[in-house]
Amino acid sequence: MATFGMANERLRALEEIEREIAAILLNAGNAILELSKEKPNERMLDKQAAQFTASVQRVESELSGQIRYLTQVATGQPHEGSSYSARKDGTMALNRIDYSRVKLAELSRTCEQMLEQP
């Protein structure tokens, strides 16, 4: 259940990034609108530019965090909420057990054949 919580949290973070990108576009549009006026209001331009810059920095920071997380997941490194590594180790152990059983059965047959020979 914790895995779903983390996944939902990641999705909420991506939705917030999407809203922030919409704010960036809105700020850029407002700045362009202000620049298109005959006498642009410098204070308004500064405010729009500051909001634009702050939003871009937040998006960059959040996306970097998301990319770091995805890099960890994609490379198979252990990360919170993942059981991939443990499942892989368990599967490999079961495969080794099966292989050992096959080899022991072959060895047993060989021993029996050797004992049956006069």
From Swiss-Prot:
Subcellular location per UniProt equals: Nucleus
Q: Which GO terms describe its cellular component?
A: mediator complex
Q: Which GO terms describe its molecular function?
A: transcription coregulator activity
**Which Cys-Cys disulphide bridges does the record give?**
none
**Keyword line:** Activator, Nucleus, Transcription, Transcription regulation
| Residues making up the signal peptide according to the UniProt record | none
Q: Which Pfam families match?
A: Med11
**Chief subcellular site?**
nucleus
One GO BP annotation here?
A: regulation of transcription by RNA polymerase II
Name the family: Belongs to the Mediator complex subunit 11 family.
Could you tell me what this protein does? Component of the Mediator complex, a coactivator involved in the regulated transcription of nearly all RNA polymerase II-dependent genes. Mediator functions as a bridge to convey information from gene-specific regulatory proteins to the basal RNA polymerase II transcription machinery. Mediator is recruited to promoters by direct interactions with regulatory proteins and serves as a scaffold for the assembly of a functional pre-initiation complex with RNA polymerase II and the general transcription factors.
Assembly? Component of the Mediator complex.
UniProt-recorded name of the protein: Mediator of RNA polymerase II transcription subunit 11
**Species the sequence originates in:** Xenopus laevis
Supply the gene name.
med11
